Design a protein with these regions (language model features):
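Conserved ATP-binding subdomain of kinase catalytic cores across diverse folds
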Residues: 20-123, 148, 152-153
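Conserved protein kinase catalytic/activation segment
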Residues: 164-178
Length: 253
């Protein structure tokens, strides 16, 4: 690739020389934590800071032009800019460090690298998959407050799934952060939209019932109607999903 563009969060300017080398060393260095269409590695900066580097696949076909010509913002660019908005609204997401874009001789977008602070020691919501009663009630309520707060602040995460909500618990209570935030909606979030956004969570039916009931209470909506609606949408979503992907445990629908 002929050209590299780099944007660095001013707080991390002192890492510049290390960050600029990432495209050259990415194949050889770091620890792989996810492989798929995109590749994610954890790497260590010279000062010992652990960073998360996500390399987005090269856009193909019409998308190559759509993103290269700036008709639509590339995913990496959105994922670099959105945390700034979330931070201002008090919603947790890994701190963005830098964005690197490679382009070829005729200006078509190659690999994009999104570099964020690595968040360790956090749980995902996959862990409530087949959790026992008595272990998840407080978490379900806290998650409901987090989702309602986000929606009331006019922010909706379009991929609000068990793997994209990380959490930890300490003496102050539960803390949540959202990841994979390149698909967001900013603007009024209706109750129906907000409830529909909860359909992808798995776990015991009771976990979902508590989550949705509490969410409805916070947003001043009928609990029965909310639970009824989300349970139907959730069953539809997981039935479709189950036809294409194996589900690792018994899903109560």
């Amino acid at each position: 690739y002929k050209e590299m563009k780099i944007k660095i969060n001013p707080k991390y300017e002192e890492m510049r020389s290390f960050l600029e080398r990432i495209p050259d060393v990415f194949e050889k260095e770091g620890r792989v934590i996810y492989t798929g269409r995109n590749l994610i590695k954890v790497m260590e900066a010279p000062d010992g800071t652990l960073i998360n580097v996500k390399r987005y696949h090269v856009p193909k076909g019409p998308n190559s032009l759509i993103y290269s010509l700036g008709i639509r913002k590339p995913k990496g660019e959105r994922a670099f800019e959105y945390p700034m908005i979330l931070e201002k609204k008090g919603i947790g997401t890994p701190a963005p460090i830098a964005l690197i874009e490679e382009r070829n001789a005729i200006g078509l977008l190659g690999y994009t690298y999104l570099i964020t602070l690595q968040c360790d020691n956090l749980h995902t919501l996959y862990e409530v998959g087949d959790a026992a009663p008595g272990t998840y009630e407080k978490l379900a309520k806290a998650l409901a407050h987090f989702a309602a707060d986000m929606h009331n602040k006019k922010i909706l995460h379009k991929d609000f799934t068990p793997g994209n909500v990380l959490w930890k618990q300490d003496e102050e209570g539960f803390h949540f952060i959202i990841v994979d935030i390149n698909r967001m909606k900013f603007g009024e979030i209706s109750i129906k939209e907000g409830l529909y956004n909860l359909r992808k969570f798995w776990g015991p039916k009771e976990f979902i019932r508590i989550l949705v009931s509490e969410y409805a209470k916070v947003r001043d909506y009928s609990v029965d109607e909310a639970v009824d609606y989300v349970m139907k949408e959730r069953a539809k979503f997981w039935t479709r999903y189950g036809k294409k992907h194996p589900i690792k445990f018994k899903l109560e629908l």
